[in-house]
């Protein structure tokens, strides 16, 4: 291959190369280039539209600042004399933290305030306003953990605050609670019911104030009770029907499919609604014997009042009378009541609709649909039951029972005072419809769980209510199964009948005894025989009060119920045996009441035993005082009672001689009543 050589003079490539020019001097033959010298400053060519670029060695002096709150790390504050949490947070720090955007920080703030309350004695009394007002906005918080912490916080707080101290804050807390019950989220509404339950226990009168205005446009006051009841209507999907009823229109049965609640959520709503209605409709006899069923038995109001006062309280104690015992009312309210009572409408086809009847009509569609959905799971034919659905059915029937008990009680009162005996109740068909749906599930069996037995007891009382209100349209088809159930319960399974169930069955017992039907005499025989088998003192108290009232019914002149079949010669022997068993119960109760072995935990039982002894003495005195009694033979009764009452005063022991009975340790009023009984019986109490 030929090589070309470059001639610099002629600027041409030559071949062969000139003489004296070697190949290594040619520029293409591997000549090493010289390195360019380093440049101190490189000039950058500016680009169009970019502006002047900063120098590469320029120093950036700009800075950014961000404020963060770290109260727990503030080392400049002296907190040695301030109440702090384990994280060294004061109350002011926690109050600021309740507004934090993080839900975890808000929850920690609530638990921190609870820690301060439970740790430092007197801290709650000094900071009541701050502790309550700070936590109120968190009742309707969007986070479930914050709401759970708030429920726990107020549970401890309200249990420690006296009622008079909490009274100024009740309205604010009720307002925030009713607002949370109307929240767009159903979960917030459900959790707000926990706070409502606390308020119903703490301030029931304020929480249920003017609840009737939710169903009556005449009450225009915007009260707490109205807002809470309207929130319940919205939860159950009957708000539109309630608004129509409030305007005086007919509340149609509306669909409730728009409200999607699970079984547990609906149970929570119904449990809170039942508690709210119990507090709203409370009366003096809500926790005692249900005497409403006896209202139609007397033609004279004075006799009814005297009958209701029997065993109501100890008549041996003097109660001071003050002007506070007189109920107050404004003049125009008294005048309106007098004028309404004076008006007599002769052309009345149905009884006027009360607030309770209107409420039952509004809730009927929702309650009945839920009941029909839950009954198959709660009362399965094979005996199995779902706990949630069983509780759901229980609270549904309790609400029905509470409403219809009040409706029919007021109806019986109006019949007695206004003489409207033939006026029916407008919505009695709804109660009959309910019983028609419950009838197939009422087997009359007392075997199974306690919940099933309690459901049967509620069914029996609903049957008695419907029978008392319907007269000629009485659901007689339900009575035979009820009679069989009562007979089985009294004769075969004594352990299943508690004092609460016995008390709930009293209206049913009275319905059976006062109605001329086959089997009522057998029920009275079973009641008298069951009394001798009772071992529980609370059940003894309830059973004695009921049977004693039945025994004293013939002594009232205005009695308008046919009870003569209850005092036939065959039943007189059973009554005689029953009254002769009372001295033994008297001695047992008096001995337990004055026993020195009674511990402090059973002081309430001792007081109940003393009350029972006083009532037995009062009944014996009322029975023995008249020379003639429609039920008992006076001479035979006095002769047989004398040796049975004597152990109350003294006992003849074969070795120890005369041993004093519990009489000397009884309170003085009880001793005076015992001495009054002894004056009618030939024994001496002073031995």
Located regions from the model:
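Alpha-solenoid helical repeat scaffolds
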Residues: 63-134, 140-168, 351-374, 423-436, ...
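Boundary/linker elements of alpha-helical solenoid repeat scaffolds
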Residues: 66-81, 110-122, 151-163, 200-219, ...
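Long alpha-helical repeat scaffolds
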Residues: 364-368, 373-687
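Short coil turns that connect the paired helices of HEAT/ARM alpha-solenoid repeats
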Residues: 98-101, 140-145, 182-184, 238-242, ...
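Hydrophobic residues within the alpha-helices of tandem HEAT/HEAT-like
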Residues: 112-118, 138-139, 150-161, 177-181, ...
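Acidic, serine/threonine- and proline-enriched intrinsically disordered linkers and terminal tails
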Residues: 26-84, 240-441
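Alpha-helix N-cap/helix-start positions at coil->helix boundaries
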Residues: 103-104, 144-148, 186-187, 263, ...
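HEAT/HEAT-like alpha-solenoid repeats
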Residues: 84-94, 123-138, 165-180, 205-238, ...
């Amino acid at each position: 291959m030929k090589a070309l050589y470059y001639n610099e003079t002629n600027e041409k490539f030559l071949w062969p190369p000139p003489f004296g020019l070697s190949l290594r001097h040619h520029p293409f033959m591997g000549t090493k280039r010289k390195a360019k010298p380093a440049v101190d400053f490189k000039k950058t060519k500016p680009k169009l539209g970019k502006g002047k670029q900063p120098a590469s060695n320029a120093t950036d002096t700009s800075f950014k600042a961000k404020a963060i709150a770290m109260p727990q790390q503030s080392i400049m504050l002296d907190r040695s004399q301030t109440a702090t949490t384990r994280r060294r947070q004061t109350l002011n720090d926690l109050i600021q933290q309740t507004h934090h955007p993080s839900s975890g920080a808000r929850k920690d703030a609530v638990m921190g305030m609870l820690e301060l309350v439970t740790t430092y004695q007197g801290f709650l009394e000094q900071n009541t306003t701050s502790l309550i007002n700070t936590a109120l906005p968190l009742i309707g918080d969007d986070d479930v953990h914050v709401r759970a912490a708030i429920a726990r916080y107020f549970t401890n707080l309200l249990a420690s605050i006296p009622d008079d101290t909490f009274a100024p804050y009740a309205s604010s807390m009720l307002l925030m609670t009713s607002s949370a019950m109307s929240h767009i989220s159903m979960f917030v509404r459900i959790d707000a019911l926990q706070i409502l339950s606390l308020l119903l226990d703490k301030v029931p009168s304020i929480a249920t104030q003017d609840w009737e205005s939710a169903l009556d446009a005449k009450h225009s006051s915007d009260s707490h009770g109205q807002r809470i009841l309207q929130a319940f209507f919205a939860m159950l999907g009957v708000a539109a029907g309630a608004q129509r009823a409030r305007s005086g229109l007919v509340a149609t049965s509306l669909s409730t499919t728009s409200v999607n609640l699970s079984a547990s959520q609906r149970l929570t709503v119904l449990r809170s609604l039942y508690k709210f209605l119990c507090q709203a409709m409370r009366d003096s006899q809500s926790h005692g014997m249900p005497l409403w069923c006896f209202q139609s038995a007397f033609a004279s109001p004075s006799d009814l009042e005297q009958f209701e006062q029997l065993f109501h309280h100890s008549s041996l104690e003097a109660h001071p009378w003050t002007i506070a015992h007189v109920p107050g009312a404004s003049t125009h309210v008294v005048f309106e009541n007098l004028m309404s009572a004076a008006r007599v409408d002769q052309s009345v086809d149905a009884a006027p609709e009360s607030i309770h009847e209107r409420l039952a009509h509004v809730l009927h569609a929702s309650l009945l649909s839920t009941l029909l959905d839950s009954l198959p799971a709660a009362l399965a034919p094979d005996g199995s039951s779902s706990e949630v659905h069983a509780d759901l059915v229980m609270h549904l029937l309790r609400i029905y029972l509470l409403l219809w008990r009040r409706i029919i009680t007021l109806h019986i009162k109006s019949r007695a005072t206004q003489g409207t005996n033939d006026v029916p109740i407008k919505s009695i068909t709804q109660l009959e419809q309910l019983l028609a749906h419950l009838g197939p599930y009422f087997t009359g069996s007392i075997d199974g769980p306690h919940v099933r037995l309690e459901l049967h007891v509620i069914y029996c009382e609903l049957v008695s209510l419907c029978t008392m209100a319907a007269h000629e349209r009485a659901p007689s088809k339900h009575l035979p199964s009820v009679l069989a159930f009562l007979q089985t319960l009294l004769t075969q399974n004594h352990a299943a009948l508690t004092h609460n169930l016995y008390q709930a069955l009293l209206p049913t017992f009275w319905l059976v005894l006062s109605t001329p039907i086959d089997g009522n005499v057998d029920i009275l025989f079973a009641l008298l025989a069951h009394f001798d088998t009772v071992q529980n003192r609370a059940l003894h108290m309830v059973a004695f009060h009921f049977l004693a009232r039945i025994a004293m019914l013939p002594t009232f002149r205005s009695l308008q119920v046919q009870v003569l079949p209850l005092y036939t010669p065959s039943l007189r022997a059973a009554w005689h045996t029953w009254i002769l068993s009372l001295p033994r119960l008297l001695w047992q109760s008096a001995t337990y009441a004055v026993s020195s072995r009674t511990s402090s935990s059973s002081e309430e039982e001792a007081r109940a035993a003393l009350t029972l002894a006083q009532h037995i003495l009062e009944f014996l005195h009322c029975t023995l005082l008249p020379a003639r009694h429609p039920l008992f033979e006076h001479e035979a009764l006095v002769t047989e009672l004398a040796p049975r009452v004597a152990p109350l005063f003294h006992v003849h022991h074969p070795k120890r001689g005369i041993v004093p009975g519990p009489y000397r340790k009884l309170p003085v009023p009880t001793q005076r009543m015992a001495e009054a009984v002894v004056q009618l019986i030939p024994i001496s109490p002073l031995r």
